[in-house]
From Swiss-Prot:
It comes from Saccharophagus degradans (strain 2-40 / ATCC 43961 / DSM 17024). Transmembrane segments: none annotated. One of its GO terms (molecular function) is rRNA binding. It comes from the Bacteria. One of its GO terms (cellular component) is cytosolic large ribosomal subunit. Pfam families: Ribosomal_L1. The gene is rplA. The lineage of its organism: Bacteria, Pseudomonadati, Pseudomonadota, Gammaproteobacteria, Cellvibrionales. Part of the 50S ribosomal subunit. This is Large ribosomal subunit protein uL1. NCBIfam families: rplA_bact. Keywords: Repressor, Ribonucleoprotein, Ribosomal protein, RNA-binding, rRNA-binding, Translation regulation, tRNA-binding. InterPro entries: Ribosom_uL1_bac-type, Ribosomal_uL1, Ribosomal_uL1-like, Ribosomal_uL1/biogenesis, Ribosomal_uL1_3-a/b-sand, Ribosomal_uL1_CS. CDD domains: Ribosomal_L1. Binds directly to 23S rRNA. The L1 stalk is quite mobile in the ribosome, and is involved in E site tRNA release. Protein L1 is also a translational repressor protein, it controls the translation of the L11 operon by binding to its mRNA.
Length: 231
């Protein structure tokens, strides 16, 4: 039998897998169990009452978290002319058209978000096989295909989270760092759930937000008592 690490022993001692924790309890416990030397990301997993096989029950979008993600987001923008200069001034690391596309085809992937103005999609469309599998393809539903590229850059830099239900109907997203206080994580989670409720498909039946859990990069998953949230 494999020997358990000190951290795993602590997790086994402290975590009750049958319990639904208040958001405050969950954050305190995750912080107690975080023994690594970096500030772990706090990840939310939200099980939705949808059938993702049905096209009219696809759930995707973007949420601006009130306290950001704690992550330094690097942005690539496809645009030209005055928009290009404005995007650079707003903080975009990479701005261009065909030249930027060639860099990406050559393997340059040093960015977290890709934004495009509508006219640039003729160029971005050729990168579908590169950007698509990584979840980086711009999309109007997530606000990353827009004539307002400056606003999109600012949103991305401020900690906007893009979400999309997976094949199991689960939304995954980083909502902050373990170094955040409990209230900041709570308000970020509530903002995400609030936007998910607004995006509820009309054809979805029964309980919509079925389960909410939080985990850290290296830690356990804790079920959240939804009555401790105001979303």
């Amino acid at each position: 039998m494999a020997k358990l690490s000190k951290r795993q022993k602590l997790i086994n001692e402290k975590v009750d897998s049958t319990k639904a924790y208040s958001i405050e309890e969950a954050v305190a416990l995750l912080q107690e169990l975080s023994k690594v030397k970096f500030s772990e990301t706090v990840d939310a997993a939200i099980n939705l009452g949808i059938d993702p096989r049905k096209s009219d029950q696809a759930v995707r979008g973007a949420t601006s978290l009130p306290h950001g993600t704690g992550k330094d987001v690097r942005v690539a923008v496809f645009t030209q002319g005055a928009n290009a200069e404005a995007a650079k001034e707003a903080g975009a690391e990479f701005v261009g058209m065909e030249d930027l596309a060639e860099q990406i085809k050559g393997g340059m992937m040093d960015f977290d978000v890709v934004i495009a103005d509508p006219a640039a999609m003729r160029v971005v469309g050729m990168l579908g096989q590169v950007l698509g599998p990584r979840g980086l393809m711009p999309n109007p539903k997530t606000g990353t295909v827009t004539p307002d590229v400056v606003g999109a850059v600012k949103n991305a830099k401020a900690g906007q989270v893009r979400y999309r239900a997976d094949k199991g109907g689960i939304i995954h997203g980083g909502i902050g760092k373990i170094s955040f206080d409990a209230n900041a994580i709570k308000e970020n989670l509530e903002a995400l759930i609030s936007d998910l409720k607004k995006a509820k498909p009309a054809s979805a039946k029964g309980i919509y937000v079925k389960r909410v859990s939080l985990s850290t990069t290296m830690g356990p998953g804790l079920t959240i008592d939804q009555s401790s949230l105001t979303a």
